[in-house]
Design a protein with these regions (language model features):
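A conserved mid-protein helix/loop that constitutes part of the nucleotide-sugar donor-binding site
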Residues: 25, 205, 209, 214-228, ...
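Short, structured helix-loop element that forms part of the nucleotide-activated donor/catalytic region
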Residues: 52-61, 234-260, 271
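Membrane-proximal helix-turn-helix segments that form the acceptor-binding/catalytic region
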Residues: 91-94, 141-158
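Short His-centered aromatic/hydrophobic patch
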Residues: 103-108
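Short alpha-helical donor nucleotide-sugar binding micro-motif in glycosyltransferases
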Residues: 266-267, 274-279
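Aromatic "clamp/platform" in nucleotide-sugar-dependent glycosyltransferases that forms part
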Residues: 287
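Short hydrophobic beta-strand element within catalytic cores of glycosyltransferases
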Residues: 304-307
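Conserved acidic donor-binding segment of nucleotide-sugar-dependent glycosyltransferases
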Residues: 322-330, 338-344
Length: 378
C-alpha cells in the first residue's frame, strides 16, 4: 500500500498543550510527531479554562507546532464537561474530512459510532478503566461504560497501555486489542532554584508525589504512612485537584499537624522540572492506573521510585524500583523507611532508572507504531 499522508483527528483530551492529565501529554507527543512526519493532525480542544485555573492556560492559537487546534463547545459543569465535549466533538469529527479519528479515553468513545457511520477509520486508546474511578457520579460512570461498549463494537482498532487491560477486554468481551505503551523522552536535569525559594527544598531533601489529587492515586495511604516515618525529609504532594476539590481538602485535613507535608498545587515548567530533578525518591501509591506517565517521567529524571504492586506500575518498572502491596499503609511505611535509611540502595536504583526507561519507552517508535495501526484499511 502506498504511504499516503493521513488526515487525522484526535479527541477525548481536555486541551493541548497542557499537563492537565496524562492523556493531554500523550495526545501532544503523538500529534506533534505525526505532523513532523508529514501528516495533517487536528486536535479538538475543550472550550473553557485549565482545570487548575485560567492562570495555567497556555495556548489559545489555532495551531501548535503544526497541529491544528479546534475548540469544541463544552458545558463546563463537573461531571458533564467530558460528556458534552465528546458529543459535540464526535459530531464534528463525523463531518470532517479525516482518514482517521482517534478517540482517547473510554467516555468519549460513546460517540465513536458516528464517525464510523460516516466511513472514517476509528481508533480508540483506552488509557485506563475509567468507570472504576471513584470521582465519577452515576451518570458519568454510565456514560463511560457506554463508551467502553461502543469502542468494543465499533472501533477498527483498540489500543491498550497495559497487559491487565488487554486481558480485561479479552476476558469480558472477547475483543482483541493492540498493546502500544506511552513513551518518555530524555531530559536535562535542573538544579534546585525555584523550589528552594518557594518551599525550602534542596537536592534529596524530599519525597515526591506528582499527579492529580484523586482517590485512586492512593495519596491517603501515602500521607498516613509518611506521618509514621521518622525522617527529616519532606513529602511534596504536587498536583491539581481537577474535579475533586472536596477530596483535596480531605487530604489537607489528613496531613494537618505534620509540617513536613507540603501541597504545591498544580505545577508545570521550571518548577515541575526542578521537582523531578532533585527528589530523593518518587512514589506512586495508586490503586488504579492506565499507564502512569508521571512514573515514566520520574524514572527518566533518574529517580528511585516506590510504587504499588498493581500490574500497570510493575510492568513499567520491572526490577528497577521498590514495590509495596497496594492499599497497604504499613507496607508502604516499611518501604519509605527502607528508602530513607538505605541511601546506597536508593543510589543504585537512581543510576539504573534513566537508561532503562528511555530505552524501553520511546515516543518516536510509539508514534510510528500508531501510524502503522492507522493505515490498516486505508
Amino acid at each position: 500500500m502506498a504511504r499516503k499522508k493521513l488526515k487525522i483527528c484526535m479527541l477525548g483530551h481536555k486541551r493541548i498543550p497542557s499537563r492537565e492529565g496524562g492523556i493531554e501529554i500523550v495526545v501532544e507527543e503523538l500529534a506533534t510527531r505525526m505532523v513532523a512526519l508529514g501528516h495533517e493532525v487536528t486536535c479538538y480542544n475543550r472550550s473553557g479554562h485549565h482545570v487548575s485555573g485560567k492562570e495555567f492556560d497556555q495556548h489559545k492559537n489555532k495551531e501548535y507546532k503544526g497541529v491544528k487546534l479546534k475548540t469544541i463547545f463544552t458545558l463546563n459543569i463537573k461531571g458533564i464537561a467530558a460528556m458534552s465535549s465528546s458529543v459535540f466533538g464526535g459530531i464534528r469529527a463525523a463531518f470532517g474530512k479525516y482518514d482517521v479519528v482517534h478517540f482517547h479515553a473510554e467516555g468519549p468513545c460513546a460517540m465513536l459510532w458516528l464517525p464510523k457511520l460516516f466511513g472514517k477509520r476509528c481508533v480508540a486508546t483506552i488509557h485506563g478503566l475509567d468507570h472504576q474511578r471513584e470521582k465519577w457520579n452515576k451518570l458519568a460512570s454510565t456514560y463511560i461504560m457506554l463508551g467502553e461498549k461502543c469502542a468494543v463494537k465499533f472501533a477498527d482498532e483498540i489500543i491498550v497501555l497495559s497487559e491487565s487491560v488487554q486481558n480485561y477486554f479479552e476476558d469480558i468481551y472477547g475483543r482483541k486489542t493492540r498493546f502500544i505503551p506511552n513513551g518518555v523522552k530524555k531530559i536535562e536535569i535542573k538544579s534546585a532554584g525555584l523550589i528552594t525559594e518557594k518551599y525550602g527544598l534542596t537536592k534529596d531533601s524530599y519525597i515526591l508525589f506528582l499527579g492529580r489529587l484523586v482517590p485512586e492515586k492512593g495519596i491517603r495511604y501515602l500521607i498516613e504512612a509518611f506521618k509514621d516515618v521518622q525522617t527529616d525529609k519532606k513529602l511534596i504532594i504536587a498536583g491539581g485537584s481537577s474535579d475533586t476539590d472536596e477530596f483535596a481538602n480531605e487530604l489537607k485535613e489528613l496531613a494537618k499537624g505534620d509540617e513536613r507535608i507540603i501541597f504545591t498545587g498544580f505545577v508545570q515548567g521550571q518548577e515541575l522540572e526542578e521537582l523531578y530533578s532533585n527528589a530523593y525518591i518518587y512514589t506512586l501509591p495508586s490503586d488504579l492506573e492506565g499507564m502512569p506517565l508521571s512514573l515514566l517521567e520520574a524514572m527518566s529524571y533518574g529517580n528511585c521510585c516506590i510504587v504499588s504492586n498493581i500490574s500497570e506500575c510493575t510492568e513499567v518498572v520491572e526490577d528497577k524500583a521498590m514495590i509495596f502491596k497496594k492499599s497497604d499503609v504499613s507496607d508502604l511505611k516499611i518501604r519509605l523507611e527502607e528508602a530513607c535509611n538505605q541511601s546506597e540502595m536508593v543510589k543504585v536504583l537512581k543510576n539504573q532508572a534513566t537508561e532503562f526507561i528511555c530505552s524501553k519507552y520511546n515516543w518516536d517508535k510509539i508514534a510510528q507504531e500508531t501510524l502503522n495501526l492507522y493505515r490498516g484499511n486505508i
